[in-house]
Amino acid sequence: MPEMGVFLLATQAMAAPGELLNLALNAGAIAPEGAVLVAMLATLLVDLAGEQAAARWVPPICYAGLGTALVLLAQQWNAPLEPSFLGAFLADNLAIAFRAVVALSTLLSLLISWRYAEQSGTPIGEYAAILLAATLGAMLLCGSTDLVSVFVSLETLSVASYLLAGYMKRDARSSEAALKYLLVGSAAAAVFLYGASLLYGLSGTTSLQAIGIALLTSPTPLAALSLVFVLATVAFKIAAVPFHQWTPDVYEGSPTPVVAFLSVGSKAAGFALALRLLVGCFGAFDNQWKLLFTVLAVLSMTLGNVVALAQTSMKRMLAYSSIGQAGFVMIGLVCGTEDGFAAMVLYMAAYLFMNLGAFACIILFSIRTGSDRISDYAGLYQKDPLITLGLSLCLLSLGGIPPMLGFFGKIYLFFAGWADHQYLLVVVGLVTSVVSIYYYISVIKMMVVKEPKEASDVVKSYPSIQWSTIGMPPLRIALVGCVVVTAVGGILSNPLFQWANNAVAGTPLLQEAIALGSQRSIG
């Protein structure tokens, strides 16, 4: 019947736009972020039912959301690449790897948070919701391929981080940390917006790939100026010198579980942003931004590890240590080779476990003593062998002592740097690694070598462990898990390195940059 044929054609014509829109959106790419979002909304709803309901249901909701996100990320691994949301997001292997680091850092941060929140009287529903919001922003930032999505994701992460830093409202140091973080972060956001506006004006598009092509065909002085603004924002997010001033104060004043997340999750998102922007947009200025990052890496490794020697607070010491660690990761970024990018991804995964393991020990010590001073750890081995062993292994790994996981992470970075003729970075990295070993071992020596009569007053009155207390079992799971991976992961580092290699091989952006770099070196 002619009428039926006309009807079918009309139906197909009406369905076609919807199908095209579905293909253009490809919403399945952000299914892991959807799981985190659902967990965040459920946490807020449960929190409305009262503190008792929140204490009972918020932890399992968070575990379910983050666990689901990790499973969905595993399913996306090596999947066919399709741009999402009209080209604003891409779930390539690089994005999946960094999103997994962010999600896992949040999961471990939550495990070490519950006892801390219970003892300090912090409402866990609001705290968990804000932390999940920061996680959502960080995960979206790892896969953003458009200036608009980059800015929205960046601000989602930043605003949630400001709230987390000042969450202990009655603590003057927490409020001070939040204010400093807000002021410096707002300035960084303004600088990024100015750089992004220059890029849009020069290219007429917000797509990072299209911007990179436009700058390759017609590089201009204004493009170089935009590079400076964008690089300043990236350096702020990864706490590179000289954009590091906020780090020690924020780390010292913020709640310790928040610091644990910022030191890993936020930093991982920052390095993912660096790869998307610098490698993706500024291929025309490859030599220039690599030179600038070489300077930042040298300054970060030197200042971070040298100033850490003089610290008396554990959190401030780890703050300067994290600045130095960022310098090590930048070696892989400057190399721009397949080995360099893979070593960068591997070291971020290793840093996740060894740094969060150290923070788990610090939290366990602080909730039992209320102290953060390094001198108060004197003689701790006599009263708490678990914290002593766990903190010692994590600090040795951060220092790069074999056969810990951190040693193999640094070896891969230094090998990639040497192969790419980055001799200055490798030499500075080796020297500053030796410096870092000194202050890490100083803490270990204080805990282990001190005689009982030389123990600090805090350790002498150290309370016995009650593992059945609310929030203690998850803390023990996180601590033991991180310490085991840190200690054993070095011996079994080959699968991790294979995973990092696959992350680079499954990312067209990095493969194009590697090929372009090879052509330039041959030419």
Swiss-Prot record:
Lineage: Bacteria, Bacillati, Cyanobacteriota, Cyanophyceae, Synechococcales
TM annotation in the entry: 29-49, 57-77, 94-114, 123-143, 147-167, 182-202, 221-243, 255-275, 291-311, 317-337, 345-365, 389-409, 424-444, 477-497
Catalytic reaction(s) noted: a plastoquinone + NADH + (n+1) H(+)(in) = a plastoquinol + NAD(+) + n H(+)(out); a plastoquinone + NADPH + (n+1) H(+)(in) = a plastoquinol + NADP(+) + n H(+)(out)
GO cellular component: plasma membrane-derived thylakoid membrane
Cross-referenced Pfam families: Proton_antipo_M
Assigned keywords, A-Z: Membrane, NAD, NADP, Plastoquinone, Quinone, Thylakoid, Translocase, Transmembrane, Transmembrane helix, Transport
Family indicated by similarity: Belongs to the complex I subunit 2 family.
Stretches of the chain forming a coiled coil according to its record: none
Location(s), subcellular: Cellular thylakoid membrane
Oligomeric and partner information: NDH-1 can be composed of about 15 different subunits; different subcomplexes with different compositions have been identified which probably have different functions.
A GO BP annotation: ATP synthesis coupled electron transport
Membrane topology type: Multi-pass membrane protein
EC main group: translocase
Listed EC numbers: 7.1.1.-
GO function term, MF aspect, one: quinone binding
Record's protein name: NAD(P)H-quinone oxidoreductase subunit 2
UniProt main location, coarse: membrane
